């Protein structure tokens, strides 16, 4: 890890934009500039994959593909394949600070289809190169999505057996029958990748590093499970034998039933973990640092019988441990990873995090919350090790303001005593709480944007085990104020976390 630094957690979807959802538009570039002026070194985002039912970025149709929602329509207007009038004619939803996913789904894809049909993409050398270089995942993904659209979006396990089980004649038939639909899917991935890499390059030139995020598991309804069932615990009909989740704890009496297929770790070991190596090699093209969700699943994973209604009957199974990361290191060298080691943590999980050398995560909200079944002392800021990343909360937690309102009076009293602060109004407590972890020993400190803004739980990103109200929050442009920027700059400077790197272009100009 580099020297002391700070960053902000801000999903791409939450950026301001003209057309219903944050994307790789001008606003994203302006946010990079804003981060730089605030003295930040890192921009942490959520997974970028195409989302399915529930809109969760942790349940994606592909491990490798990007979400077409994030393609900048403004950029396509500049290319001449869309018009501004066409984009403005779409109903993107009434609430500026929230995402209406139904309207996004109904509005974006027809526009992207128009852009594809006007693009003459088959004559584009860069497109052809992209398709060639990424054929190892793109070919299956594009076919998967084209067939899914043909079957009105139903899960692949409900498809006819010939294409569900990838029989040769059926594969050939659909590749020919859906040729233009497949090319459309490839076009969207090309534009996603092109625009994202341009944005990342801009951020890096400004001295901003991107912290990406990958789920440990893939979704059952994904191109990954359809194309490579051998990687997962599926039976001969490609039905899961067991699925992932979490055991009951202080937050949930029945645990969490995620429903993702589990890995067939024996097969991965036999193949030298090649799929994982390919996956991580690819994501390190997209991001500078990678946060791996549910890191404890590499030590032990919770296995729940397929068809169970809760996680109560699940049990722990042994994961690959350091064997996987040794192989990854042999293939890719040292890579900057953040291990999400929250929740139920055992000594063996701690050993794995330590042996990997990856920094773990420390979340302030857990320090004073008696509902947490782990050791709260681990989350008190004076105990944070240098090799860790400190957060007030994550996308799965309440906002600081929401958390303060949900904890007991005794916990509020304990928090104020720890802060040595009995006078700050509740509406402004986010500031001393943020300062608390900014001055900790943790080398990196990442604050969700909602906490800098002091927003309540109406702006919470996700409530685990719920569907329908999550992943919707968007920042308004006027909230990215110069005043807030200066406040963040001040606290970052005060605790030795400033980004002193020069803008690459400005430095080059100065030398002329």
Language model: regions and residue ranges:
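Mature N-terminal, pre-catalytic/accessory segment of carbohydrate-active enzymes
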Residues: 1-39
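Structured C-terminal cap/extension of enzyme domains
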Residues: 454-512
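Catalytic domains of carbohydrate-active enzymes, especially glycoside hydrolases
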Residues: 26-51, 286-287, 437
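Alpha-amylase-like alpha-glycosidases and glucanotransferases acting on alpha-linked glucans and related
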Residues: 2, 11, 17, 55-193, ...
């Amino acid at each position: 890890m580099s020297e002391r630094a700070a960053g902000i957690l801000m999903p791409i979807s939450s950026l301001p934009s003209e057309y219903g959802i944050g994307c790789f538009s001008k606003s994203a570039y302006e946010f990079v500039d804003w981060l730089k002026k605030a003295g930040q070194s890192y921009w942490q985002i959520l997974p970028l994959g195409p989302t399915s039912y529930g809109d969760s970025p942790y349940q994606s149709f592909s491990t490798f593909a990007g979400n077409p929602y994030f393609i900048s329509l403004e950029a396509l207007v500049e290319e001449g394949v869309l018009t501004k009038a066409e984009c403005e004619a779409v109903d993107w939803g009434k609430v500026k600070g929230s995402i209406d996913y139904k309207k996004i789904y109904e509005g974006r894809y027809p526009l992207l289809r128009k852009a594809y049909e006007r693009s003459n993409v088959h004559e584009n050398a860069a497109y052809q190169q992209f398709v060639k270089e990424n054929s190892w995942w793109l070919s299956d993904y594009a076919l998967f999505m084209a067939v899914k659209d043909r079957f009105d979006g139903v899960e692949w396990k409900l498809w006819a057996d010939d294409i569900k089980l990838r029989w040769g004649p059926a594969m050939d038939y659909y590749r020919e029958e859906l040729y233009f639909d497949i090319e459309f899917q490839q076009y969207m991935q090309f534009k996603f990748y092109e625009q994202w890499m341009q944005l990342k390059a801009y951020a890096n030139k400004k001295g901003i590093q991107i912290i990406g995020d990958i789920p440990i598991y893939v979704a059952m309804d994904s191109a990954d499970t359809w194309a490579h069932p051998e990687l997962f615990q599926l039976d001969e009909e490609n039905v899961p034998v067991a699925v992932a989740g979490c055991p009951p704890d202080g937050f949930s009496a029945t645990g969490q039933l995620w429903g993702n297929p589990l890995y067939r770790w024996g097969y991965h070991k036999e193949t030298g973990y090649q799929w994982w190596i390919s996956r991580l090699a690819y994501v390190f093209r997209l991001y500078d640092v990678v946060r791996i969700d549910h890191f404890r699943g590499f030590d032990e994973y919770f296995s729940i019988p397929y068809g169970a209604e809760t996680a109560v009957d699940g049990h722990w199974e042994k994961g690959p441990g350091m064997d996987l990361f040794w192989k990854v290191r042999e293939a890719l060298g040292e890579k900057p990873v953040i291990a999400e080691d929250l929740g139920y943590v055992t000594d063996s999980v701690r050993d794995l995090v330590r042996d990997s050398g990856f920094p773990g995560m420390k979340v302030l909200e857990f320090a004073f919350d008696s509902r947490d079944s782990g050791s709260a002392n681990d989350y008190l800021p004076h105990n944070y090790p240098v090799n860790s990343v400190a957060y007030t909360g994550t996308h799965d937690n309440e906002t600081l303001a929401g958390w303060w309102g949900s904890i007991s009076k005794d916990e509020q009293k304990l928090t104020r005593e720890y802060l040595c602060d009995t006078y700050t109004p509740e509406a402004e407590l986010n500031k001393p709480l943020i300062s608390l972890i900014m001055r900790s020993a943790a080398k990196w400190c990442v604050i969700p944007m909602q906490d800098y803004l002091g927003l309540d739980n109406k702006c919470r990103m996700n409530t685990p085990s719920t569907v329908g109200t999550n992943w919707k929050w968007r920042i308004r442009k006027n909230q990215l104020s110069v005043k807030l920027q200066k406040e963040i700059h001040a606290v970052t400077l005060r605790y030795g976390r400033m980004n002193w790197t020069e803008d690459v272009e400005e430095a080059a100009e100065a030398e002329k």
